[in-house]
Design a protein with these regions (language model features):
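Sec-dependent signal peptide recognition
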Residues: 1-10
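Beta-propeller-forming repeat regions
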Residues: 13-650
C-alpha cells in the first residue's frame, strides 16, 4: 500500500468527521413512560398552552445542548379527574434564557425574564420581548467575596402586592456575594464564608396596571428583618389561609420551602417569621434534588393552591395542597409526585456519565450511568445482541446494601460549599474488580473518594454490597488534594472530585488497574498487585504522557475548578493500541502511540465530531450495540441525555 493511501486512512480515522452526526439515543419503545424531563434546570410554566381546556406544561431549560422553551402537551384531559397525566414528548417553542417566571393575573398569564415581558409566550416562547422599564441589574450586592458570581437567580413577577388595584413588580434575588464560590472550609469542616441570601424586593406601582410607574424597590420584611431564604427565593404572594390577604411562599437553592404568613392586612401587608413547610406526616416538605423552582398553581382544580416544582435535573413535580392548615398556621402539602411523559430519548438526570456494559448477562450492551443526583441508573437493552438501534426499558436506580444507592455531599462534602448538599456527581466504570467473574462498579463522586460496589449476586441478577474504599498501598499517610479539609482513612484513595475512574489492565498482567487523575490533576497509573493474597493498588505513577513523554496534566486548576475530567480508554482506531477519549466539545481523541521509554504516550488529535454538545462537560463512553466488535461513541451530556456516534472506521 502506498504512503499517500496510508496517510488518507490515518486522516479518515483521526480527524473530526464532518459527516458524522451525534444523535440522541431513543427509547424505541412507544408504550414506555418515563420521568418528564428537560435538560439541566427546569423552570415550569403550567398553563393551558393549546387552548383545549386542560393544563399543559411549558418548561424553560437554559442549558446546553437542550436550551429551549419546551411544551409538554397533556393528552389525557382534565387534571381535576387525572392530576398525573402522561404527557406527550416535548415540542420546542423557542430558545430561552435564564429565570423565566410566569405571573397569573386577572387578565391572563404574563411571562417575564429580568427586565422584559414576553407576549404570546404560549405560542412563541421568548421570541418576542418588551422592556419593563426597570434595569435587570438594579440590585447591588453588599458582600465582598472575590470569587464566584455576585448574583445568580433573578426572578421577576407581577402581583398587586398592596391591594390598591395596580400590579406591582416583585423580584427575587439570589445573592452570592457573601458566600463566594469554593475552598472556604476550615480543618473542622466549617464553612468560613457567609451563606447564600435570597431576598424579595417590591417595586410599588404608583401608576396604573396599564401605565405603570414604579417606585424605588424595598425589601420585604418578616418580623422586622428582611425575608432571607438560602438562595433562589422564587417568591409567590397568594392567599394560602383564605383570610383575604396575600401570604408569601418561597423556595430556595436547596430542596425546601418557607412560608411567611401575612399577619397584617390586604392593604398593609406584614409578615410573620418564616416557617418551614411540612407534609401531613410531619416530615419536612422537600424535593428529591435541589435548585428548585416552585410555581403556585391550582393544578387539580380543587380550589386550593398547589405547587408545580422544577428540579435541577430537569424533572417537574406536582406538590398537592391538602387543603389543611397545620397547627403552626402553615399550609400542609403532600409529598412531591414527579410527572411522567411518553418515552422519547434516554435521559439520566443531568450531567450523565454513561458506561456501556452487559449488566444482566444476556449478551447485549446495557448502560449504567451516574448523574448530578449521585444515583447510579441501569438502562436495560431489551433488544438482545447485535441490534444497532435497541429498544430500552425505563431506568432503574441501582441498589447497594439493600437500599437505593445515592451519594450526596451533605452539609460539608462539596469543595464548593454547603449549597451543594444534595448533589453527588457519580462517575463510574463497570469491571470485575475482585476477579470473581462478576461485574462490580468502581465510582468517584462529589467527595473525591474512590470506592467500589461489590457484586455478590449472579451474572444475570447482580446484587451489590454497600460501598467500600479502594485499597492503596501507600508508604505513609494517603495524599489528598491541597484543598480537601478532611483526612482520608489509611490505605484509601482520595483524589480530585467528579473525574472518571478508568478500570483497565493497562500493563496486561491479568489484573485490572486504575487510571485516573491524581491529587494534582495528572493522569496517573495505579498498578494493581497482590499483597498477602489481597489485591491492592500501588501509589500513582505519572507515566501517561504526551507525544514527547511529558506527563499528561489534564487539569491544573484548584478547588472547585479541579477534577471534572471525564474519559475512557479504548482502541478507537483499530491499530491495537489504546487511545483516550477525553471530554471536550464532544470528546477529544488522544491517539495512543504505545509504550515508549517506560511511558504510555498519546497525541491529541481533536474532537470526534464537529457538533458541540458541551455544557458542564461531556462524559465519553463506548458501546457496541450492533455486535461488530468496533467501539462506537456514547457521550453523556449536561442535559442528561446520551449522544451516539457510529465509529467511522471500516
Amino acid at each position: 500500500m502506498s504512503a499517500p493511501i496510508n496517510l488518507f486512512i490515518l486522516l479518515a480515522i483521526c480527524l473530526p468527521h464532518n459527516n458524522q452526526t451525534l444523535t440522541e439515543l431513543s427509547y424505541n419503545n412507544i408504550n414506555q413512560s418515563v420521568y418528564l424531563g428537560v435538560g439541566l434546570w427546569a423552570w415550569p410554566i403550567p398553563c393551558d398552552a393549546d387552548g383545549d381546556g386542560d393544563f399543559d406544561l411549558i418548561v424553560s431549560c437554559p442549558d446546553k445542548p437542550s436550551n429551549g422553551v419546551w411544551l409538554f402537551e397533556n393528552a389525557t384531559g382534565n387534571t381535576k379527574l387525572n392530576p398525573m397525566p402522561v404527557f406527550k414528548p416535548a415540542r420546542r417553542l423557542s430558545s430561552t434564557s435564564h429565570y423565566v417566571m410566569p405571573s397569573y393575573t386577572d387578565t391572563g398569564m404574563r411571562v417575564l425574564t429580568p427586565g422584559f415581558e414576553h407576549p404570546d409566550f404560549q405560542r412563541t416562547g421568548l421570541t418576542k420581548r418588551l422592556p419593563l422599564g426597570i434595569s435587570a441589574r438594579f440590585y447591588v450586592p453588599e458582600g465582598t467575596q472575590p470569587k464566584g458570581p455576585k448574583v445568580r437567580h433573578n426572578q421577576w413577577r407581577l402581583v398587586d402586592y398592596d391591594g390598591d388595584g395596580s400590579r406591582d413588580m416583585i423580584v427575587g434575588i439570589e445573592d452570592w456575594s457573601h458566600y463566594g464560590w469554593d475552598d472556604a472550609w476550615n480543618s473542622k469542616g466549617e464553612w468560613r464564608n457567609g451563606p447564600l441570601h435570597g431576598f424579595v424586593f417590591v417595586f410599588r406601582n404608583k401608576g396604573t396596571t396599564e401605565a405603570p410607574l414604579y417606585d424605588a424597590p424595598f425589601k420585604v420584611l418578616a418580623e422586622g428583618a428582611p425575608v432571607d431564604t438560602f438562595g433562589c427565593p422564587s417568591p409567590h404572594f397568594a392567599d394560602f389561609d383564605n383570610d383575604g390577604d396575600l401570604d408569601l411562599l418561597c423556595g430556595e437553592f436547596l430542596d425546601g420551602f418557607t412560608y411567611f404568613e401575612n399577619i397584617g392586612t390586604r392593604r398593609n401587608p406584614r409578615y410573620a417569621s418564616g416557617k418551614r413547610l411540612k407534609t401531613a406526616t410531619g416530615t419536612a416538605l422537600a424535593m428529591d434534588l435541589q435548585m428548585i423552582v416552585p410555581i403556585v398553581f391550582d393544578w387539580d382544580r380543587d380550589g386550593d393552591l398547589d405547587l408545580i416544582v422544577g428540579d435541577e435535573d430537569g424533572r417537574v413535580a406536582w406538590v398537592e395542597n391538602t387543603g389543611k392548615m397545620g397547627a403552626d398556621h402553615t399550609p400542609v402539602f403532600s409529598a412531591p409526585r414527579y410527572f411522567q411523559q411518553q418515552a422519547d430519548t434516554l435521559k439520566c438526570g443531568a450531567l450523565a456519565t454513561p458506561f456501556g456494559f452487559d449488566w444482566d448477562g444476556d449478551g447485549d450492551t446495557d448502560i449504567i450511568s451516574g448523574n448530578t443526583a449521585g444515583t447510579i441508573e441501569f438502562f436495560e437493552n431489551l433488544s438482545g445482541p447485535k441490534v444497532a438501534n435497541p429498544k430500552w426499558a425505563a431506568p432503574k436506580q441501582i441498589k447497594a446494601g439493600g437500599k437505593p444507592f445515592r451519594m450526596m455531599a451533605g452539609a460539608n462534602g462539596s469543595i464548593q460549599g454547603p449549597a451543594e448538599a444534595k448533589w453527588g456527581y457519580t462517575t463510574l466504570n463497570v469491571a470485575d474488580w475482585n476477579g470473581d467473574g462478576l461485574p462490580d462498579i468502581v465510582f468517584n463522586s462529589i467527595l473525591g473518594k474512590v470506592e467500589w460496589l461489590k457484586n455478590v449476586g449472579t451474572r444475570s441478577k447482580p446484587v451489590l454490597e454497600s460501598a467500600v474504599p479502594l485499597l492503596v498501598d501507600w508508604p505513609g499517610a494517603p495524599p489528598k488534594p491541597a484543598w480537601t479539609w478532611w483526612e482520608p482513612q489509611p490505605g484509601t484513595l482520595a483524589t480530585q472530585w467528579r473525574t472518571t475512574p478508568v478500570v483497565i489492565d493497562l500493563n496486561q498482567d491479568g489484573l485490572p488497574d486504575l487510571v485516573m487523575l491524581d491529587t494534582e490533576g495528572y493522569l496517573a497509573f495505579f498498578e494493581r498487585f497482590r499483597k498477602n493474597s489481597t489485591l491492592h493498588l500501588k501509589p500513582p505513577q505519572r507515566i501517561l504522557g504526551d507525544a514527547k513523554g511529558n506527563p499528561l496534566r489534564l487539569n491544573s486548576k484548584t478547588a472547585g475548578a479541579s477534577g471534572r475530567r471525564k474519559l475512557c480508554m479504548v482502541d478507537w482506531n483499530g491499530d491495537g493500541i489504546l487511545d483516550i477519549l477525553l471530554n471536550g466539545t464532544n470528546a477529544d481523541l488522544y491517539k495512543g502511540l504505545g509504550k515508549i521509554d517506560g511511558s504510555w504516550r498519546f497525541e491529541k488529535v481533536g474532537p470526534l465530531a464537529t457538533q458541540n454538545i458541551e455544557g458542564h462537560d461531556v462524559s465519553p463512553a463506548v458501546v457496541d450495540f450492533d455486535g461488530n466488535s468496533i467501539p462506537d461513541f456514547l457521550g453523556g451530556a449536561e442535559d442528561g441525555r446520551f449522544y451516539f456516534m457510529k465509529n467511522p472506521r471500516p
